[in-house]
Amino acid sequence: MSKKPVALIILDGFALRDETYGNAVAQANKPNFDRYWNEYPHTTLKACGEAVGLPEGQMGNSEVGHLNIGAGRIVYQSLTRINIAIREGEFDRNETFLAAMNHVKQHGTSLHLFGLLSDGGVHSHIHHLYALLRLAAKEGVKRVYIHGFLDGRDVGPQTAPQYIKELQEKIKEYGVGEIATLSGRYYSMDRDKRWDRVEKAYRAMVYGEGPTYRDPLECIEDSYKHGIYDEFVLPSVIVREDGRPVATIQDNDAIIFYNFRPDRAIQISNTFTNEDFREFDRGPKHPKHLFFVCLTHFSETVKGYVAFKPTNLDNTIGEVLSQHGLRQLRIAETEKYPHVTFFMSGGREEKFPGEDRILINSPKVPTYDLKPEMSAYEVTDALLKEIEADKYDAIILNYANPDMVGHSGKLEPTIKAVEAVDECLGKVVDAILAKGGIAIITADHGNADEVLTPDGKPQTAHTTNPVPVIVTKKGIKLRDGGILGDLAPTMLDLLGLPQPKEMTGKSLIVK
C-alpha cells in the first residue's frame, strides 16, 4: 500500500509584500507557487518579533524559525523571555532574586549587580539592571553596588558615558545603588582563557585594586585621553573622599550577574563560585558563602543559582512522529541541513527512531549569487526517489536559495534563485499529490522579498514581512493570524495525530 506523505516544504527566506520594487519573490516567474496559491487554501503567518520569541519588531532568522516550526509553540529567546517577565511582573516575583535579597538582609551584607552596561541586547540589556535596582529598592535592600562591564563592541566604542549617566539617573530615581567598579569587557568577559585579564577584573571587585577615581565619568574621560575606549578600559575602582573603595565583594554577600548570554559569563563566574579554582591565586580575601545568581544557565561548571532556568523543548514534531511509529525524512542542502535537523528537533543532534536524513552538498562557489540554483535540483532528484519508494509518512524539506542568494542583495540572481525553487517545488508537490499526499508550503522568514533599499542599494538582511502557507487539500479552510508555531500542529492534524500539551500552537485548519 502506498504511503500518503504529508510534506512540510520550507522555502527559506521567501516572504510576501505588495511592493514589487526590489522584490525578487514578486518579480520571479513562479507558475507552480502561483498555481498552488490560487487552487488551494492559503494564508500568511507572522515570522518575526514576539510571534517567534524575539523582541517586537526584530526580524526572524532561520535558527529561530525552525525552532518555532519544530516545537509547535513560541520559543522565547532569553532577551524576550526576560523582557516579558519584567513587563508582566513575573520578574519581581522571581524566587531566585528574592532569595538573594533575603540573604543579604539576613546577614546584613551587600548585594552586587554586575554585567555588561549597554542596551546592545547581545549579552545583556541595561534595562534588566534597572529592573533589579527597582526590585532591590522595593525589597528594602540598602547596600547595592554595581560593577559595570563596559561594552564598546555590540554598541559604539565610545558610548559608556551615556550609559553611566543614564544609570546614575536611575540610581537617583530609585534611591538605591552605587557604582563600585568599571571594567572593559575585554577583561571581565574574556572567554579565551586569558586569565590574567579576568584576574584584573576580579581583583578590582574583591580587593579594590586598580586605578582609582572619585567619579565613574572621570574614569572614562581619563581612559579616552589615553586612547583607551570602552571595551578595553582597565578594571578601575571608584573610591570615596577618604580614598577607600565604595565597595568590595566580601563574605556572605550576594551577586546577581545580569548577562543572559553564557559564553562570556562563564570564566568570571567560575572565579567566584568554583572551590577547586586553579587559574590564578584568588588570595586571602576570596569571598566565602556568596549567594551567586546567574540570570540564565551559564554552564555546569558555574556553581550558582539560576534565575531563568532553561526551557526544555519536549515533544517537538520529530519526537511526536516517532512516538506514533511514523517514518520521517529530513532533507536539505548543507547550508540549511542543521535547520531541518538540529533546530527542527529543538536543539537535539540525535535522530529519533524512524527518522532518516539526507544531506546534499551545497555548491563550492565563493558566493551563491554566482550559482543561484545552488543544489536545489539535486535535493529535488534525491527526494523524488524517496517519494517514489513509498517509505515515509512525513517529509520535512528546506530549499535554501531565496535566503542564501537574497543575502547577496543582488536582484537578478535572487529572481533566478526563486525561479529555480519554483521549478523544483512543482515536481515535488505534484509527486506528493500523485501519491494522495498533502504538502504544506511555507517559509521561515523573509529575505528575497526585499533585496534592494528604496534608493537601489543592496538590502542583505532578513525582512519582517509575513510568510505564505498553502495546504494542498481542497475543502478545508485556513484561519488568518497564525504564527510559525502553528505549523507542527497543522501537520499533526493532517496526519490524524493528537497534539501534545507542550505544543501550544494551534492547527491552522478551521474546524
Swiss-Prot record:
Pfam families: iPGM_N (PF06415), Metalloenzyme (PF01676)
Pathway in which this enzyme or protein is active: Carbohydrate degradation; glycolysis; pyruvate from D-glyceraldehyde 3-phosphate: step 3/5
Cofactors named for this entry: Mn(2+)
Manganese among keywords: yes
Activity regulation remarks: Could be inhibited during sporulation by acidification of the forespore, thus allowing accumulation of the spore's large depot of 3-phosphoglyceric acid.
Modified residues (Phosphotyrosine): Y36
Reactions that this protein is recorded to catalyse: (2R)-2-phosphoglycerate = (2R)-3-phosphoglycerate
GO terms classed as biological process: glucose catabolic process; glycolytic process; regulation of sporulation; sporulation resulting in formation of a cellular spore
Residues annotated for substrate binding in this entry: H123, R153, D154, R185, R191, R261, P262, D263, R264, K336
UniProt: Mn(2+) 2 binding residues: D12, S62, D444, H445
Signal peptide as annotated in the record: none
EC number(s) per entry: 5.4.2.12
Domain of life where this protein originates: Bacteria
Effect of S62A: Loss of mutase activity
Active site location: S62
Impact when changing H42N: Decrease in activity
Keyword terms of this UniProt record: Glycolysis, Isomerase, Manganese, Metal-binding, Phosphoprotein, Sporulation
Family membership noted in the UniProt record: Belongs to the BPG-independent phosphoglycerate mutase family.
HAMAP family in alphabetical order: GpmI
Cited function: Essential for rapid growth and for sporulation. Catalyzes the interconversion of 2-phosphoglycerate (2-PGA) and 3-phosphoglycerate (3-PGA).
Protein name (record): 2,3-bisphosphoglycerate-independent phosphoglycerate mutase
